[in-house]
Structure formats: C-alpha cells, structure tokens
Amino acid sequence: MREIVTAVEMKELDHNTIQKAGISSPVLMERAALKTVEEIVQRLKNKEKEKILVVCGTGNNGGDGLAIARLLQLRGVRTWYYIAGKEEKMTAETAGQLKTAEYYQVPRVHNLDPDEYTTIVDAIFGVGLSRPVEGKYAELISTMNRASAYKVAVDIPSGIDSDTGFEKGIAFRADLTVTFAFRKRGLCFYPGRMYGGEIVVTDIGIYSIPGKKICMHHLEREDLKMLPERVPYGNKGTFGKVLLIAGSEGMCGAAYLSAAAALKSSAGMVRIQTVEANRIPLQTLLPEAMITCDFDEKKNQAMLDWCDVLVIGPGLGTGAQSRERAQWFLAKAAECKKTVILDADGLNLLSVHDNWKRFIGEHVILTPHIGEMSRLCGKEIGKIQDLSLIHISEPTRLALI
C-alpha cells in the first residue's frame, strides 16, 4: 500500500527530512528536478525537435521548475523558462535556482506564447496553494491549457487543492504529473485526479516519520499478495461465509449484484436475508446463494454466528422494516465485533440514528460516496472533501473506503 498525504503532512515530512535527517532543501529540490527530467525525457518523441517551456512561480515549486529547465538544457533539450510573479518575492531556494539557471545561460522568455512549444511544464504553485487562482495567474493557466503542447505538472497541477482535489478557480490540465515522495490526496479525488493525467510518484529521499501514522493509503496490484491462498484441500465452508442484509421490495438488483460480487471475489458461501418478493428472482439469478426471508431474533443470531463478514445496505431501503433489520444486526455485530461492511442504504440508515457512532469501531468498514458522506457528517456536499470533515474514521477507529 502507498501512503497518501495532506499538505500539512507533506510539510511535516519535508521539514523532518531537512531538520532531522540533515538533507537540505536545495538537495531535495535538485532530486525532484532530476526525477521530473527523467520522466519527461522518457516521453520525448524526438529530442532534437522538442521545444520545452517551463513556467515557474516564485515559491519552491518554481525552484523545482528552474532546476528542471537547467537540467533539460544540459541534456541537450531546447528549453526556456518563464517567471510568473515578481522576483523579489521568490523564496531563497528559488532565487538560488534562478541564479544557477542564469549561470548556465538557460534562455528566459518574457512574453509567453505557449503555441511555440512542444511541451509545457507547470511549476507555478505547489501543494501549499491556499487561495483561489485569479487575475494574471488565472489568465496564464488558461493560456497554457489552450496550447496543444504535451503538458507536465510538477508535484501537483497548479490550481488544484492538494487536500481536496477541488479546482481553485482554474487549474492546469496536465497529461503527466510527477509528484514527489508521496501521492497527494488532491491527486486521488476528482477533479484533481482528472487534471493530473498520468501520475508518477518519485522517490526523492523523503520518507515516513518513525512512529508517525499516515491514515490514508491506496492499494496497488502487488497488495493482492496479502490475500490468503486458497488451499487445494479446502471447500466452500473454508473459503469464507458472507451474510448480506440487502434488498427491499422492488430493489432486488442491488442484492443480486452484491451477492454475485461476493461469490466472484472467491467467497465460499453467500447467504442473503431479504424480503419475500425477492426470493424467486434471486434463486433464479443466483442459485448458488442461500436465501432467507424470515426476520426473527433466533434465526438472525444463528446467521450472524455463521458468517465471517456481514454486509448491510445494498437495495435495503430506508423504511421502518429496513431500519429495524439494519439496527438489529448493527447492534449485535458491535457486541461480538463481527466484521461489517456498510454500504448504500446501510449508510443512509446509519446517518439518521442519533447516536450512530456507538454501532461502529475497528470491526466496521464504510464505503460512502460523497452524498452518503454528506449525510453521515451532516455537512453540505460542497464541503465534504475538506479532509478535516471526513476524518470520522479517526476518532471512531474504522476503515473508510
């Protein structure tokens, strides 16, 4: 699994590397530039015909850009740089990179015409952008976006909030984003994910802080190795038992799709507790699943004891009967710490309960989309991707997917 960081977490990791590991900011900047240049050069179709423009801001992202321009030029790729902003506002590191670029006579342009170039590199704003992009910066990014050139973003596309993925007025639309050390959360959420294009995470020598936990991760193909192998002498009873509390009248499809997915993902046995109206369709579509339409506590307890994983919600509905079913299983699962996956109407029913957090803990996995998360948090959808609002997983110690 790869860790995904916020701007604050990235700043802390960066600071730890500089202050405690003793690797200076200019060294990290040079490493970032080298990694970006490697990714760009790999994608050049004809180095002799390429014309690359690096658009640099005055912060450290701009310093990365100036170093990129210099290294490309030294590799024999025709490269120019453009400074967006006033030089007197440059950070010390970026001012140092400008001095180095001038020493190596990397050509600078003062009038921007992006259509002259085959590749445009965006190094205007980094992960610390905290205000809307307006005025000349908005015009600049708009001009860059209109160009037909191949577009590369340094660390994150300028104008994308690195925590939420939201567009701050306008954002650079990259074909490739080379991000450093860790993937930023804004490159996972839309529209930031879309604006990032192909996303490459590069190692520049910034690592996790020992004992410091980063709570968000994304899976990679190699993580499939964590799944246990199916032993050749096993049987359906040893490959996992799934109980679905799913499907209300007229909502058979969600129950069917969820149960079929459980079987396809190698569960040995699947049982569906649903309403009587869904029995025949489910038995016809999915004869390998077991169907139960009774709701009494003795049978419920037997099913709960039987299963390894409990899934509540697909097509369940939010009526009184559905609420009763969901709350009974939630309460009993909380007592025995049975693994529970809450999805769809399971989340909607949870959100209307006054004290819903008492039902959840480390045994619970929530799978909300943005609307369901809005109802759980009691916040407007437009504010949900402010990550300070969706950290319900932290105080309650549950898994959020």
Regions found by a protein language model. Name each.
Residues 1-81, 91, 187-340, 344, ...:
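Small-residue (G/A/S/T)-rich helix-start motifs and N-terminal tracts that mark the onset
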Residues 38-123, 132-154, 333, 357:
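Nucleotide and nucleotide-moiety/phosphate-recognizing core
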Residues 97-98, 137-138, 174, 326, ...:
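Amphipathic alpha-helical segments in well-structured domains
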Residues 98, 118-125, 307-316:
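Small/polar-residue-rich loop-to-helix segments that shape phosphate-bearing ligand pockets
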Residues 98-102, 170-171, 191-194, 357-358:
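Short, conserved catalytic or adaptor-binding loops enriched in Gly and charged residues
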Residues 114-118, 171, 304-305, 359-360:
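A short, aliphatic-rich alpha-helical micro-motif
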Residues 118-119, 124-213:
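Internal gly/pro-rich beta-alpha loop/helix module
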Residues 401:
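Cytosolic catalytic cores of cyclic-nucleotide second-messenger enzymes
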